[in-house]
């Protein structure tokens, strides 16, 4: 399964990298992105593993970015507020049997909420 992790703060980005490393150990293909304007592409490049493909700063609108990933059938992990994820996926939700799995994790990594394609898509 191909997974995209997106964060919105530096702390969220650090958690994204930790999660990505663990998922890569389980043979998942993981991409790490952030919308945190305090992190430059150079900082992101230096702090991530070489195996994280297509990682970097998201300059486009988060809804457009999310729609593109969902059209590629990639699972999404949002690190941050559930409301951000819900708004980002809203225009791309079509069919519970075909939608990409989407989960939200708080910045501390304590709570995980599957918000789309839980049973069928594998988010649970």
Where are these regions (language model features)?
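N-terminal beta-loop-helix "entrance" segment that forms/cooperates
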Residues: 30-68
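Short gly/pro/ser/thr-enriched loop/turn and capping motifs at secondary-structure boundaries
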Residues: 12-13, 39-41, 108-113
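Short Gly/Thr/Asp-enriched flexible loops that form oxyanion-binding sites at enzyme active sites
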Residues: 86-99
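Active-site and donor-binding regions of nucleotide-sugar-utilizing enzymes
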Residues: 85-86, 114
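Short coil/turn connectors at secondary-structure junctions
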Residues: 1-2, 28, 71-75, 97-101, ...
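Short His-Asn-centered micro-motif
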Residues: 78-82
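Short, glycine-/small-residue-rich phosphate/pyrophosphate-handling segment
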Residues: 110-124
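N-terminal basic/disordered segments at the start of proteins
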Residues: 1-38
């Amino acid at each position: 399964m191909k997974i995209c992790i997106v964060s919105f703060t530096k702390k969220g980005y650090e958690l994204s990298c930790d999660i990505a490393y663990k998922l890569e150990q389980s043979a998942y293909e993981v991409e790490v992105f952030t919308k945190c304007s305090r992190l430059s592409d150079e900082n992101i490049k230096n702090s991530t593993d070489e195996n994280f493909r297509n990682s970097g700063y998201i300059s486009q609108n988060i809804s457009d970015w999310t729609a593109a990933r969902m059209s590629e059938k990639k699972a999404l992990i949002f690190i941050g507020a559930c409301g951000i994820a819900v708004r980002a996926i809203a225009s791309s939700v079509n069919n519970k049997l075909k939608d990409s799995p989407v989960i939200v994790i708080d910045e501390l990594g304590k709570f995980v909420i599957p918000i789309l394609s839980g049973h069928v898509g594998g988010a649970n």
